[in-house]
Swiss-Prot record:
Gene3D superfamilies: Glutaredoxin. Homotetramer. This is Glutathione peroxidase 2. GO terms for molecular function: glutathione peroxidase activity; phospholipid-hydroperoxide glutathione peroxidase activity. InterPro entries: Glutathione_peroxidase, GPX_AS, GPX_CS, Thioredoxin-like_sf. Keywords: Cytoplasm, Oxidoreductase, Peroxidase, Selenocysteine. The active site is at 40. The keyword Cytoplasm applies. Its EC number is 1.11.1.9, 1.11.1.12. Mucosal epithelium of the gastrointestinal tract. Catalyzes the reduction of hydroperoxides in a glutathione-dependent manner thus regulating cellular redox homeostasis. Can reduce small soluble hydroperoxide such as H2O2. Can reduce cumene hydroperoxide and tert-butyl hydroperoxide, as well as several fatty acid-derived hydroperoxides. Cannot reduce phosphatidycholine hydroperoxide. The lineage of its organism: Eukaryota, Metazoa, Chordata, Craniata, Vertebrata. It is an enzyme of class 1 (oxidoreductase).
Amino acid sequence: MAYIAKSFYDLSAIGLDGEKIDFNTFRGRAVLIENVASLUGTTTRDYTQLNELQCRFPRRLVVLGFPCNQFGHQENCQNEEILNSLKYVRHGGGFQPTFSLTQKCDVNGQNQHPVFAYLKDKLPYPYDDPFSLMTDPKLIIWSPVRRSDVSWNFEKFLIGPEGEPFRRYSRTFQTINIEPDIKRLLKVAI
């Protein structure tokens, strides 16, 4: 069994720029974590909505995208190619994320990133689709397989300002529709 952090604030990641992202600096802010892929069918929609949420809550929300190639090999770029892929291919049109992206990682299996080991332990399935599973077993390329595994690109995890995982959302739940939960956590009038 992989090590699972005791607290959200004990976690960290490495950004696309190679710098450490220390989650301890997120105290007092809500955090939205989403596994992303630049060649998925919903890349344009999801990246646009992540940008929108980051812009609506610039100081009180941290949005982190974790590129992952475990679902249909839809993030097959190297770390240094991801931003150019988003800018010129899909999303395209000069798109630039307004939120932080980490280096590519696994979200499932033996080599899963500690952030996802922690989040899946605290939130074992999406609240909007508790029966969500990988739809095509032939696409499972990791081991071991667990019921709590992320099932595809663009699954989301929302963490409250005290570092408590609040809710997990399936890939079919549109990112922008998380806004009421963010407002609730930040106690902003809806």
